């Protein structure tokens, strides 16, 4: 019974060989109940023997960490449910060093050389099974493919649409118009009282990604309402049913049965069907645009020309691209403005620099502004939207990392929060200091290896150039149009404390207000 409670409530499932269950070893904070010492009548001698063997008689015994981490993942799981996993793991690195054991069969690495080796193309490391959770639909998507070959083939379909030159040639005018309207909305609210910038940046990013991927989302910022598909997608990824289906299938199927008699439960247990119904518009727009040869051509228009995608592939990939391209951009811009507006002297420098730009802003011109790009990079270093773990499975036969042999049944994770705040790499690591990016001598080779706010290698964020374009144009436009903006009274260091929300780091209050009054 205790093992079942651990599996169903805390976040683990039985072993792979048990039928009807999906193993999610590698879930951030997973509790390895099958490898932990149980209690009660089910705590057999074999259970205890297995837990002791893994804790003290495998190569992982040499890796430093708290004594309990070798026996149980309960403490790590608690940090996940308390939304502070990044802070907990970071505290372990501060105490035990760059390579630390955080669970019976999980380690975290905060060494930049080792991190690059883990994530480089051809390293043999694969995304951990945890990523199987991150699909809004019944098939894998561009984000959660574990097989490198499948991922490479799908990525190739979309890659040319995300090159910097392609974005500037085809999409920059549209992106600029959406950002311009967003800044106007923010300024209007701020003049009247306060503007909640995180909400506006989210709508802006939603509209840009919808437009670019499948040609939808027109008017999201103007109307102040998200695309129906986006709303269904967010509900799908955040609902109880999505987790129950993977962690406790009996509860999932019971919920679906009860939903026939309790209609409100249908929003929870039939969210996938409703998401796909809303996704019909995504498919029709993508395929119609291909026939019409619309300009600019959206991402799926180009992908359908280069390869075969089913309707399910389109909807599932659209969901993944929207999730990866909306909230992270909004979160990053929110923290960027908070960092700058908290420092009036830095704010004046940025305002003075963007004021030198004449006429309509262009991404190319913004890219040449040293102070603007320095504050962007420094905010991404400290408050990038993806500070949490990136779990990987080692190649067959195991691998040596930082002098330690790691068996192939271990989960090896890295987290940007620790790599980008490592005091042995960064001077005053926890201090916002944009000037470090204005001098090449202060960004060492180690720092270059450690700075990966958009991920590594072949798995680097597909939309890195779009994300940076949005940040440059939005920040430049904001500081040119909203000179003298101040943070709202409700904004404090505590309200902006980073909460580790599953796969993103968000402000505790999930909002940030600014004013021009």
UniProtKB/Swiss-Prot annotation:
Q: Which InterPro entries match?
A: Cyt_P450, Cyt_P450_CS, Cyt_P450_E_grp-I, Cyt_P450_sf, Cytochrome_P450_monoxygenase
Enzyme class label: oxidoreductase
Origin species, per record, is Emericella nidulans (strain FGSC A4 / ATCC 38163 / CBS 112.46 / NRRL 194 / M139)
Q: Which residues bind heme?
A: 461
Q: Does the keyword Oxidoreductase apply?
A: yes
Cofactor(s) recorded in Swiss-Prot or TrEMBL: heme
The cross-references to CDD domains, in alphabetical order and at most eight, read: CYP_fungal
- Provide the GO MF annotations for this entry: heme binding; iron ion binding; monooxygenase activity; oxidoreductase activity, acting on paired donors, with incorporation or reduction of molecular oxygen
Tell me one GO biological process term: sterigmatocystin biosynthetic process
Q: Which gene encodes it?
A: stcB
By sequence similarity, the record places it as follows:
Belongs to the cytochrome P450 family.
Q: Tell me the Pfam families matching this sequence.
A: p450
Question: What name appears for this protein in its UniProt entry?
Answer: Cytochrome P450 monooxygenase stcB
Asked if the record carries the keyword Iron, the reply is yes
Q: In which pathway does it act?
A: Mycotoxin biosynthesis; sterigmatocystin biosynthesis
Induction pattern: The genes forming the sterigmatocystin biosynthesis cluster are co-regulated and induced on oatmeal porridge or the fungal isolates were grown either on oatmeal porridge or in YEC medium (0.2% yeast extract, 5.0% corn steep liquor). Expression is positively regulated by the cluster-specific transcription factor aflR that binds the palindromic sequence 5'-TCG(N5)CGA-3'found in the promoter.
Q: What is its EC number?
A: 1.14.-.-
Q: What does this protein do?
A: Cytochrome P450 monooxygenase; part of the gene cluster that mediates the biosynthesis of sterigmatocystin (ST), a polyketide-derived furanocoumarin which is part of the most toxic and carcinogenic compounds among the known mycotoxins. The first step in the biosynthesis of sterigmatocystin is the production of hexanoate by the fatty acid synthase (FAS) units stcJ and stcK. The polyketide backbone is assembled by the non-reducing polyketide synthase stcA by condensation of the starter hexanoyl-CoA and 7 malonyl-CoA extender units followed by cyclization and release of norsolorinic acid.
Please describe what happens when the gene is knocked out: Impairs the production of sterigmatocystin and leads to the accumulation of averufin.
Q: Which UniProt keywords apply?
A: Heme, Iron, Metal-binding, Monooxygenase, Oxidoreductase, Virulence
